[in-house]
Each structure stands twice: as C-alpha cells, then as structure tokens.
Amino acid sequence: MLSAALLLPAPAKAVSADHAYVLDGVTGRVLFEKNAGERGLIASTTKIMTALVVCEQCNVLDRMRIPGEAVGIEGSSMYLKEGEVLTLQELLYGLMLSSGNDAAVALAIYCGGTVEGFAELMNDKARNLGLADTHFENPNGLDSPGHYSTARDLAKLAAYAMENPIFRKTVSTRSVTVGQRHLTNHNKLLWRLEGADGVKTGFTKAAGRILVSSASRMGRRVICVTMNDPDDWNDHCALLNRSFSDYQICPVVVKGQCVGTLEVLGGENSRVEVLAAEDFSYALTPEETVRIALPGPGFVYAPAVEGAEAGFAYALISGKAVGKIPIVFGETVEQKPEEEKSFWQKWLSGKNKET
C-alpha cells in the first residue's frame, strides 16, 4: 500500500481540454495533468458527490414519496412526478444515468432535510477528503459563483467514490428500468472503451463539457478528468489507453523486506536492519527505476526493539521522493552495558572531584 501522495506527473500532451488530470487509482501517481489546480464550474459532475453522500449516509433501499419541490427542476431530468414513490437506489440511477436534476433535489431533501442542508453535507465530505479547492452550493451542479472544483479534486473525489460498491455499481450500469422509465447512461465510454466502469458527464454553456471517467483493467483503476473539453470522448480514450500501456504497477518492496541498516549508538551491535512494514508498489514506465533511501541522520540510540517503529524509508525516482514506506527494526539491539572502571580510572575520577 502507498502511504504518501505521489508526485512526478507526466508532461502535458495535446488535449482539447482547458483542464485535465489523470490519476492512477492504485498508487495515487499523477500520470498526466494540465492546469489541474485551477478552479472552474463543474456542472453535473457535482452529482458524484451527491451520490457519494447518499450512498454513505442513507439506506438506498429506503423508499421516498417525491415532494413537489423536486418536480420540474430546470435542466436534465428523469421526469419525476409529485407523490410517486421510489427507492433511493432508483433515484440514484436517475441521478447518475439520466443526470436528473430533479433526482438530485429529491435525494437532497430526503438525506439533508433541505437542499441547503444537503449542500453542507457535501461540503463536510469535501473537507474530510482534503478537497481544498472544492465548494458546493447545490446537489445538481447548476451554475453558481460559489460552486466550483478543480480537475485534481474531481479525480480524487472519483477515486474515493469508486471504492464504494453501491456507487460503483450505479455508475457502471449502462441502462436500467425504473417504473415506466428506461434510463440509459450518458457515459458513452461504457460502450466505447475497454474496462470503462464510470463515472459522470456534465455540461452547461458556462462550464462547457466536463467528463470524469474511470476504467479498470487487470485489477488496476485509472481516473481521468477533463474540464471544458469539446473533444472529451476521444481525449479520454487516448489518455486512459496511454495510461494503461505506458505505466505498469510494479512491486517495489514487500512487507518484511530489508530496506537498509541504521547505525546504533550505544548498542551491543553497531548496526541494525530495518524492514518495510507494508508492501509498496508504484506505477512505472519501463525506463524508470525506484531507489529506496533511509532518512538522515542515519542512526538511532540503543535500545532498538524488534518490530518497533523506526520511521520511514523514501522511494525515489531520479532523486525525487514519490512516496514513503513505514519501517520497523528487524532485530533487537540492547544498550551496551557500562564498562567497569579500572583502579586508576576510579582514582583519577576521585582526584578530579577533589579539585
């Protein structure tokens, strides 16, 4: 497992998007970025957070009666009718497949009491996930000056959300029937790209085309985000395919592997082995190698106890830290007992005290 944010994004290549970000979902390595930290409108990709909050805080088997406030909402819709009864899961399908703004309002009222109350839940979750450049004012993504995110934050949000099995099942569904409605997922990548399994489209005139996608191949997931991208389908296919072909997940160290030695000051032995406390893998190109380095000053004071925490080792590529691995002592090194003083050492010590 990776225990630190990973660096070294690939240089920006030609994409039509104003903002883009590609994230390896296993190791957290940034595979590509372009203006990824600039805030912008995010349209219906907002609904990733809406769905996540519902999945985490509500029982999706609950049934709700649709209130009048959730009917006739502007923009994309699943065409809810006042008084009809649907499960939250059915509303999630309407939210994430049909991009229903009405479904977003219905879910917000059920889970948050009010739209405003639900927006606070969304912002609480954003803070919890460390999405410092994200703020929500509504559950559907209708344009608002205080409603924004970045390509980087959207990728982090999507990577987290795809770990939730209910969310993952919902966004990977191509089509479903809800009552008399046949809902088809707006995400064309589910049909066009090998391994595509989510997550959300978005569009307003002010925001342009926004797309957050996920693809999984051989147990590895990659998240891709573009903002204001007129050629998003082709860009995502190219970025995701390139990510899978150019990078492979490579084991760097395994738990229990010796990663070096430290000097032991005042110990019965002069050095002690340190072991990786967990596995560490990283997304690498064929040309890259990872070097493991121990932090300075390179020594510890005795005693060193087998299995006790010894700090961290750092994984480096071309001298740059890309992650850190917790390490433990591989053996016990006791403190060296104080040597018995000779007669003359004791005599000299006594004379020094007298003076």
What are these regions (language model features)?
Residues 6-152, 156-165:
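Active-site-adjacent loops and short helices of periplasmic peptidoglycan-processing enzymes
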Residues 1-5:
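Bacterial N-terminal signal peptides
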Residues 131-132, 143-355:
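Domain-terminus/edge residues, biased toward the C-terminal soluble/receptor-binding domains
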